């Protein structure tokens, strides 16, 4: 038996928890603020459901084999309340978050060989606690090594593609290029289909060009045509698909703006690279949240 705890079972975390629980020898716990009776996910393969253990407090928890951290980056402090109870000497911790700073908050507190940063592209939306819509099977990428390979094995029974990659830095910045463009959706409160509007697409390209410049300075191998690749991906997606930044702004929740666009501004400044487009959307979305 493999014990797995998922901290923050929102759209992506809840979807992953449901898939993990489809394997009988996985014992899954979800760590939540708002309890629910079961997980129910509409997936491209059909509906799946699961009844993991639902924990609303870490008090009764013990260390597990795996912890999946799927909370937003601004919830790191709250995440430690759970990690203190769930992490033992052999526990591995996978960090499934947006951005390129996955492990930084955990270095020095959890042994590096037991940390697995993960880049995730699984379009999913949560309609209520425990209820998700997964629009595409999607993929997860983790660094090469024993921990990354062990993490990939957890999903061998699922249709989600798992890739163990040599150059994780490049993969993380490629995903950030996709995420940073999504700020346009949050600004105009329109789903993926807005990328068919050439004016919106040009703003998206500007955001991605800055991401490419900063990512290269950080050591990522990013192609010149990445902005066009990102737009093509948006245009090929379900036009009604809503990214998490858009969903959070529409719902009046805190936005993961720093991890998706602010990091480009911060890292750009450190390298002397101007990032006016990303700085502008950060300023506008911060103002919109006032």
Curated annotation (Swiss-Prot):
Question: What's its top-level EC category?
Answer: oxidoreductase
Catalytic residues (UniProt): 175
Q: What catalytic activity is recorded? A: (R)-pantoate + NADP(+) = 2-dehydropantoate + NADPH + H(+)
Provide the residue positions that the database annotates as binding substrate: 98, 179, 244
List the record's Gene Ontology CC terms alphabetically: cytoplasm
Q: Where does NADP(+) bind?
A: 8-13, 98, 124, 256
- State the superkingdom: Bacteria
Q: What is its main location?
A: cytoplasm
Q: Which InterPro entries match?
A: 6-PGluconate_DH-like_C_sf, 6PGD_dom2, ApbA, Ketopantoate_reductase, KPA_reductase, KPR_N, NAD(P)-bd_dom_sf
Give the Enzyme Commission number. Answer: 1.1.1.169
- Tell me where it resides: Cytoplasm
Provide the protein name: 2-dehydropantoate 2-reductase
The Gene Ontology biological process terms listed for this entry are: pantothenate biosynthetic process
């Amino acid at each position: 038996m493999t014990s797995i705890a998922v901290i923050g079972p929102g759209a992506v975390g809840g979807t992953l928890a449901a898939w993990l629980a489809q394997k009988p020898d996985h014992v899954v716990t979800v760590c939540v603020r708002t309890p629910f009776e079961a997980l129910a996910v509409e997936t491209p393969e059909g509906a799946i459901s699961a009844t993991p253990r639902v924990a609303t407090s870490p008090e009764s928890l013990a260390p597990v084999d795996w912890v999946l951290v799927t909370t937003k980056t601004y919830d790191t402090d709250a995440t430690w309340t759970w990690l203190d109870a769930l992490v033992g000497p052999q526990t591995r911790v996978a960090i499934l978050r947006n951005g390129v700073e996955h492990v930084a908050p955990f270095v020095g507190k959890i042994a590096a060989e037991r940390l697995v940063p993960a880049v995730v592209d699984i379009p999913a939306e949560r309609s209520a606690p425990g209820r998700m819509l997964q629009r595409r099977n999607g993929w997860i990428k983790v660094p090469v090594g024993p921990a990354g390979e062990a993490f990939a094995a957890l999903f061998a029974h699922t249709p989600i593609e798992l890739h163990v990659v040599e150059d994780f830095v490049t993969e993380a910045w490629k995903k950030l290029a996709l995420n940073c463009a999504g700020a346009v959706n949050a600004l105009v409160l329109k789903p993926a289909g807005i990328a068919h509007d050439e004016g919106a697409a040009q703003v998206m390209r500007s955001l991605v060009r800055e991401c490419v410049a900063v990512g290269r300075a950080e050591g990522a191998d990013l192609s010149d045509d990445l902005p066009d690749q990102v737009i093509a991906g948006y245009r090929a997606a379900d036009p009604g698909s809503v990214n998490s930044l858009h969903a959070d702004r529409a719902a009046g929740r805190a936005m993961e703006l720093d991890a998706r666009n602010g990091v480009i501004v911060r890292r750009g400044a450190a390298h002397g690279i101007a990032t006016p487009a990303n700085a502008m959307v950060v300023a506008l979305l911060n103002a919109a949240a006032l």
